[in-house]
From Swiss-Prot:
GO MF assignments: N-acetyl-gamma-glutamyl-phosphate reductase activity; NAD binding; NADP+ binding
GO BP: L-arginine biosynthetic process
Active site: 149
Stated family: Belongs to the NAGSA dehydrogenase family. Type 1 subfamily.
Superkingdom, taxonomy of origin: Bacteria
Enzyme Commission number, as recorded: 1.2.1.38
Organism: Paracoccus denitrificans (strain Pd 1222)
Database matches in PANTHER family: N-ACETYL-GAMMA-GLUTAMYL-PHOSPHATE REDUCTASE, CHLOROPLASTIC-RELATED (PTHR32338:SF10), N-ACETYL-GAMMA-GLUTAMYL-PHOSPHATE REDUCTASE, CHLOROPLASTIC-RELATED-RELATED (PTHR32338)
Pathway named in the protein's UniProt entry: Amino-acid biosynthesis; L-arginine biosynthesis; N(2)-acetyl-L-ornithine from L-glutamate: step 3/4
Gene giving rise to this polypeptide: argC
Record-linked SUPFAM superfamilies: Glyceraldehyde-3-phosphate dehydrogenase-like, C-terminal domain, NAD(P)-binding Rossmann-fold domains
Main location: cytoplasm
Higher taxonomy: Bacteria, Pseudomonadati, Pseudomonadota, Alphaproteobacteria, Rhodobacterales
Record-given protein name: N-acetyl-gamma-glutamyl-phosphate reductase
Length: 342
């Protein structure tokens, strides 16, 4: 039986990535695409590279008959999914790619996103969408909250280590290089080609990045105490990808062994042989995350590097992976995409 999906916010990059993935999914059919500001336009007008798919035209959300929908992907700006979720039929599965349900405490949402939570009564239903660590809860969930792309990249590098006793939890430094698609598709002066080309610059520095809320939430639960990491992202002039370099106090061979054991049976997480480090280009367009570990000339220091495609494994691919579990489908269905290289 084919399951019918609606994508809300389909005119953005994550919406287009969902369409690209679902176009070859054997069990999920795209039944509706919404984008209020572009309603009435053909999808091929917004994304000409998907012209061959013969997709439904974009409509306003209120034009969708959700009683005929099995699954909703919300790829909406912050604040728009919260009031919507409670209005959808209870039998509809929902995967929110935005930030509206990532943080369990509505006060944390207010702190990091500057908005009052519009659906605190719904928040307890939401399961955090880092698939590899919340698989059992996701299978039974009605609502899954996708992670931030930076949050996913760093957590894949660090989660197996946080409660292991192998690293100093008070000495974690994470330096990220981010492709510009993570900033979305809307026009921004600092994202113009002349502004970004041939430049690397930090942003949201000094403990201000919103994804820090996810690290605080997840790592502190794992450790059983407060954990605060130092985290600085940088924009680099590439379209897709995130590469996180995590500097740790710990024995590097033991760190590598712990990560290799944790991910030995994971279909989308690849831990490279000790001493090999991953490249952003080797995961672009795929749902894979590559992780490498090496030592340093300073004894007792480890470098863990993780990389993934922010639009795929960091967002839309993760969303489909979660949807597969929610719908009782094989987790890898439609997702064994080979990376695009060169």
């Amino acid at each position: 039986m084919t399951l019918k999906a609606a994508i809300l916010g389909a005119s953005g990059y994550t919406g287009a990535e969902l369409v690209r993935i679902l176009a070859t999914h054997p069990r999920i059919e795209i039944a509706a695409l919404s984008a209020d500001r572009k309603a009435g336009q053909g999808y091929d007008e917004v994304f000409p590279h998907l012209r061959h798919l013969k997709l439904p035209a974009l409509v306003r959300m209120e034009e969708i008959d959700f009683s005929a929908i099995d699954l909703v992907f919300c790829a909406l700006p912050h604040g728009l999914s919260q009031p919507l979720v409670g209005q959808l039929p209870r039998n509809v599965k929902i995967v929110d790619l935005g930030a509206d349900f990532r943080l369990r405490d509505p006060a944390d949402y207010k702190k990091w996103y500057g908005l009052d939570h519009a659906a605190p009564e719904v928040q307890p239903e939401a399961v955090y969408g880092l698939t590899e660590f919340y698989r059992d809860q996701i299978r039974g969930a009605r609502l899954v909250a996708g992670t931030g792309c930076n949050a996913a990249t760093v957590q894949f590098a660090l989660r197996p280590l946080i409660g292991s006793g192998l690293i100093d939890l008070d000495d974690i430094i994470c330096d990220l290089k981010n492709g510009v698609s993570g900033a979305g598709r809307s026009l921004k002066e600092n994202m113009l080609f002349a502004e970004r080309s041939e430049d690397v610059a930090g942003y949201s520095q000094g403990g201000k990045h919103r994804h820090l809320g996810e690290f605080d939430q997840e790592f502190s639960v794992l450790a059983g105490r407060e954990v605060r990491i130092q985290f600085t992202p940088h924009l680099v002039p590439v379209n897709r990808g995130i590469l996180a370099s995590c500097y740790l106090k710990g024995e590097p061979q033991a760190v590598h062994a712990a990560l290799a054991a944790a991910y030995a049976d994971e279909p989308f997480i690849v831990v490279l042989p000790y001493g090999q480090l991953p490249a952003m280009a080797h995961v672009q367009g795929s749902n894979f995350c590559h992780i490498g570990v090496t030592g340093d000339r300073i004894s007792g220091r480890a470098l863990v590097v993780s990389t993934l495609d922010n639009l795929c494994k960091g967002s839309s691919g993760q969303a489909v992976q979660n949807a597969n579990l929610m719908l009782g489908l094989p987790e890898t269905e439609g997702l064994m995409l080979a990376p695009i290289f060169p």
